[in-house]
């Protein structure tokens, strides 16, 4: 009888500890992550990927390769709302990142706060994937390496298992602030 009670109790504690590892800020932050769909000049889908808002007035980030050769682009929020990309503000082919403005259909959109300081090697990090589901499984890991690029910017190497569909998702610190954008490993 004791063996039968120990197994369910151990499983319950294991599940509880897994839930406890998901930071409290995830539920609110996941609403800032969206899907990106780009179209060619014939209005055929060119690419799909992810992105996220960094300001409540529609400023967003994603990977540049999604937009390469695109005639137009739209974003689709976790709630299923579609909004057009109205303006490209900057792009970097080398680091595969693009900054753009979305023509938002509301007064404001959920946005992530950008971290003011770079996380140190060994710091906890979470990657927040796009999800239309109520539950979300963020991926946790650690900062393995921090390199400075172009003087003031940082490039991070993380110990984190990432799937292909997780490219261009925000990488967050323990306070729920975004400090990076996930990219394919080279």
Could you tell me what each predicted segment is?
Residues 1-4, 20:
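Positively charged n-region of N-terminal signal peptides that target proteins for export
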Residues 4-15:
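Sec-dependent N-terminal signal peptides
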Residues 51-53, 85-88, 143, 171:
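Conserved hydrophobic positions within beta-strands
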């Amino acid at each position: 009888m004791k063996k039968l009670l120990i197994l369910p109790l151990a499983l319950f504690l294991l599940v509880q500890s897994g839930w406890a590892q998901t930071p409290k800020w995830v539920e609110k932050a996941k609403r800032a992550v969206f899907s990106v769909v780009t179209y060619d000049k014939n209005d055929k889908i060119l690419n799909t990927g992810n992105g996220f808002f960094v300001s409540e007035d529609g400023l967003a980030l994603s990977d540049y390769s999604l937009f390469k050769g695109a005639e137009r682009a739209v974003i689709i929020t976790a709630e299923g709302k579609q909004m057009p990309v109205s303006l490209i503000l900057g792009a970097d082919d080398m680091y595969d990142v693009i900054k753009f403005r979305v023509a938002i259909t509301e007064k404001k959109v959920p946005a992530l706060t950008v971290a003011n300081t770079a996380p140190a090697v060994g710091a906890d990090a979470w990657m927040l994937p796009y999800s239309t589901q109520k539950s979300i499984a963020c991926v946790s890991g650690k900062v393995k390496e921090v390199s400075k690029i172009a003087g003031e910017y940082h490039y991070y190497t993380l110990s984190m298992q990432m799937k292909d569909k997780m490219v261009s998702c925000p990488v967050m610190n323990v306070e729920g602030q975004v400090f990076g954008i996930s990219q394919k490993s080279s």
